[in-house]
Amino acid sequence: KPIVFTGTSDNIKIGEKMGTNLTVDDAGLWGGILILGKAKISASDTEGKDINETQIEGIPASDTYGLYGGSDDTDNSGTLKYVSIRHGGALIGEGNEINGLTLGGVGSGTKISYVEVVSNKDDGIEFFGGAVDCDYCLTTAHDDDGIDIDQSYSGKITNALVVQGAGSDHALEIDGPEGSMVAGY
């Protein structure tokens, strides 16, 4: 059975796979999961200068727990496996959102497998640089992109499925570097 992250208004009970009162239109009931690591990112500051560490979206700039990036592409942020992330996401401001699963500078030592994101207010899964691999990932009924890649993400995404909803934007958004570091994706 998966580990289910959902809003408090979901009437799902322990041992059940889903509740009965929420639909795919019920997004933004809570934030989302953010995993921040020390792998390489391609970012720049407000003056356009390269930086290897920056603040993740959705966390106040004054909070140092929101910093990610570094120089260790093999960084290990743990394991996220057999997880369902439902009815989350938040639009805080332009370019400042919380996705279902946000991965900032997460290294290849981290294991992410069998993750689904259902009915999220912004992107299903967003990678900000890093080198983590993600396999068996599903996003459905997201309000923006299914999978979004930024800041020279260099990991592999295998066995992924994106199912668009009525409010979805793109299945994939793949952006290049913000700084001068270029990685393959």
Annotate each language-model stretch with its function.
Residues 1-185:
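Beta-strand/loop edge motif enriched in small/polar residues
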